[in-house]
């Protein structure tokens, strides 16, 4: 191959991005959602978020959901009970895409001291912002969004517009 061809391939490879896929379960019942307090993760420790895990190699998103439900929430779910609620692309440079999934039924009951049920209209103030935004977007019927909203300038644009978060405590 010519040197020019090698350069073109190298340039193309440089622009490829490795994507981290997060799978986030929205376990809801009677207007409440199960949230876990993060601990020992190195990011957002002490903040609440729904049960979350990363897509593993050779695993489907639904298989990840089943694994996360068991490992993070202590419940068993069936593939047929999992539905797509929202997809969020992080445009801050982290290379993350999050699939927020609703689960229509499960077996078992989560009893860990780091988890609590919260009313969707009364979420904790110390909740990870991306989850709060995704829940708001899902409630408004949006199925896809970027985070931060509108890219890195999003929070300032939202404040300037007088935006109010429907899920704020």
Language-model region placement:
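Residue-level preference for beta-strand/loop junctions
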Residues: 17-19, 44, 95
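Short hydrophobic/aromatic beta-strand or adjacent loop that forms the aromatic wall/cage
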Residues: 20-24, 96-100, 132
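A cytosolic small-molecule/anion-sensing beta-strand core signal
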Residues: 29
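Conserved Nudix-box catalytic region and its N-terminal flanking loop in Nudix hydrolases
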Residues: 32-71
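Conserved hydrophobic/aromatic beta-strand scaffold that supports enzyme active sites
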Residues: 35, 100-102, 115-117
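Nudix hydrolase/Nudix homology domain
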Residues: 45, 113-169
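Active-site segment of metal-dependent pyrophosphate-handling enzymes
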Residues: 74-109
């Amino acid at each position: 191959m010519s040197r020019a061809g090698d350069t073109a391939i190298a340039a193309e490879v440089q622009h490829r991005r490795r994507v981290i896929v997060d799978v986030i379960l929205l376990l809801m019942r009677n207007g409440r959602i199960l949230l876990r307090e993060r601990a020992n993760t190195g990011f957002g420790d002490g903040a609440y978020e729904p049960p979350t895990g990363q897509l593993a190699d050779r695993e489907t998103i639904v298989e990840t959901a089943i694994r996360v439900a068991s490992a993070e929430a202590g419940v068993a779910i069936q593939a047929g009970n999992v539905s797509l609620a929202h997809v969020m692309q992080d445009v801050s440079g982290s290379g993350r895409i999050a699939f927020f999934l609703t689960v229509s039924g499960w077996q078992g009951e989560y009893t860990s001291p780091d988890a609590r049920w919260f009313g969707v209209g009364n979420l904790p103030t110390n909740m990870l912002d991306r989850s709060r935004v995704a829940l708001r977007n899902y409630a408004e019927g949006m199925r896809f969004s970027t985070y931060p909203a509108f890219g890195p300038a999003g929070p300032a644009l939202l404040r300037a517009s007088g935006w109010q978060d429907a899920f704020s405590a």
